[in-house]
Amino acid sequence: TIELYLKTFKAIQIVGPKWCGKTWTSMHHGNSIVRLTDIEKRKLAILNPKLILNENIPEVIDEWQLVPELWDAIRNECDLRASKGNFILTGSTALLDKEEKSKIKHTGTGRIIKINMFPMTTLELGKSLDYISLMDMYEEKEINKLVDPFDIYEITRLIINGGWPENLGLSNLESD
């Protein structure tokens, strides 16, 4: 999906809960990164957003919402560039307050496409065989395969660990 969107749109925005892998996924698809958690980069972006934008695309702008003015600068840069896949924006789904929201003048429609990212599913974690889905059960579809039941300990462990990529491979003690 990300590769297709980078070929189709000039910028993409990846949103989702903290720790679900937005930055890692973005870096996997990007060729350069600006981390706005770095105070010096953030100062540059506040001074003049164009100072952090470069031609080594796709450029990942991590935690873009820390400098809301970047949204319009990126939108304008998308208008100036003929190429697709210029920017990957990551960060919080919500700006901190109304004052910050007021700093964004344009929606980015047609230039910046939003991708929602979620924690990993039990199938992605290798804990499900994809025989039964919640949607199948909701739609009352016939279930034709038996699945080895999880014991209560395994179900509890999946709930506690969640679908966070950073938890993969941790022992029970480490993930607690």
Residue ranges and their predicted role:
Residues 1-176:
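Phosphate-binding site recognition
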